[in-house]
Design a protein with these regions (language model features):
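N-terminal intrinsically disordered/low-complexity leader segments
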Residues: 1-10
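Hydrophobic alpha-helical connector segments
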Residues: 76-103
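An amphipathic alpha-helix adjacent to DNA-recognition modules
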Residues: 11-22, 26, 31-35, 40-43, ...
C-alpha cells in the first residue's frame, strides 16, 4: 500500500472490508460481527474503516448502490433511449442482474438486511415531491413489485 495514492488506498480498504464482511457473514450472524473482528479479518485499521463507512450496514449499502449503478450504466450503454422493446429489455436485464449477484443479495437476505436491496431499488425510481402524485405512486408500486419478485425468487 506504500506506493498507492489516497484513492487507491481507499479502494483497497473498501474492497478488503467488503470481502471480509461477506466472508464473516458466512460463518457468523451479522449482528455478532464486531468492527474489530471485521478490520482484523480485512487486515486494515479501525480508522480506515470509519474513514470509508459509518457502519457495517453502510458497507453493504454502498456495495448495493455500486452494483446497481454499474448495472444501470451498462444497460444504458448497451440500450440507448429509443431501443425497440427497451422496457422489456430493462426488466429482463434487471432480473438477470439480481441473478448474477445472487450471492451478495442472498447474504443480505440471510442477515435480515433485505431492506438494503429495497432501499437501493427504490432509489432508482423518482418518487420526489416534484413529480405528480400518480407517477410517484406508480414508481413506488413498480419498485416494491420488483423487490417482491426478487425477494421471492431468491
Amino acid at each position: 500500500m506504500k506506493n498507492m495514492n489516497n484513492q487507491e488506498k481507499n479502494t483497497y480498504v473498501r474492497q478488503h472490508i467488503l470481502s471480509a464482511l461477506l466472508e464473516l457473514m458466512h460463518t457468523q450472524d451479522f449482528v455478532s460481527i464486531s468492527i474489530q473482528a471485521l478490520v482484523d479479518a480485512a487486515g486494515v485499521g479501525r480508522a480506515s474503516f470509519y474513514r470509508n463507512f459509518a457502519s457495517k450496514e453502510d458497507v453493504l449499502q454502498q456495495e448495493s448502490v455500486r452494483l446497481t449503478n454499474e448495472w444501470k450504466t451498462n444497460f444504458d450503454h448497451e440500450h440507448p433511449d429509443g431501443t425497440p422493446g427497451q422496457d422489456n429489455l430493462w426488466l429482463v436485464s434487471l432480473l438477470d442482474f439480481y441473478k448474477d449477484h445472487a450471492e451478495f443479495y442472498l447474504a443480505l437476505y440471510h442477515a435480515g438486511l433485505s431492506n438494503i436491496m429495497l432501499e437501493t431499488l427504490l432509489g432508482y425510481f423518482d418518487r420526489s415531491p416534484e413529480i405528480p402524485n400518480g407517477l410517484a405512486y406508480l414508481n413506488s408500486a413498480i419498485g416494491y413489485m420488483l423487490y417482491g419478485w426478487v425477494h421471492e425468487w431468491m
